[in-house]
Amino acid sequence: MPYDYDLRCPCGTGLTYGQCCHRYHAGNHHAPTAEALMRSRFTAFAAGETDYLLDTWDPATRPAELTLDDRLEFYRLEILETEGGGPFDATGRVKFQAFHRGLADGVQEEDSTFRKMDGRWVYSLGDVAE
């Protein structure tokens, strides 16, 4: 389901989707930081952009396919902590909470690692809090 270009982006920046994560999902730009990639991936979960999720996943850990359950709605992202992940770093870490409702209401807390591959950030691994 495509996300509305004029709605506020679910990643939490306060910008519209068209001003924010759409440029990454459309392939016009690459996220400049690990946090920006995390935000764009959260929005991809919210928008059902599975191709983008797979494309920004480290090939060493990426699943062969990805199916999202459209009964689960991701609606809010809170960044708790970042380490590294800047434009000149090779690795980064982003700890966040992803709020969801629908099939199951709740919050998922994850500590994710990222690395630069061929000059662009990719998601490597995530440690989900119990």
UniProtKB/Swiss-Prot annotation:
InterPro entries: NTF2-like_dom_sf, SEC_C_motif, UPF0225, YchJ-like_M. It holds the Pfam family YchJ_M-like. SUPFAM superfamilies: NTF2-like (SSF54427). PANTHER family: ADENYLATE CYCLASE-ASSOCIATED CAP C-TERMINAL DOMAIN-CONTAINING PROTEIN, UPF0225 PROTEIN SCO1677. Belongs to the UPF0225 family. This is UPF0225 protein CE1570.
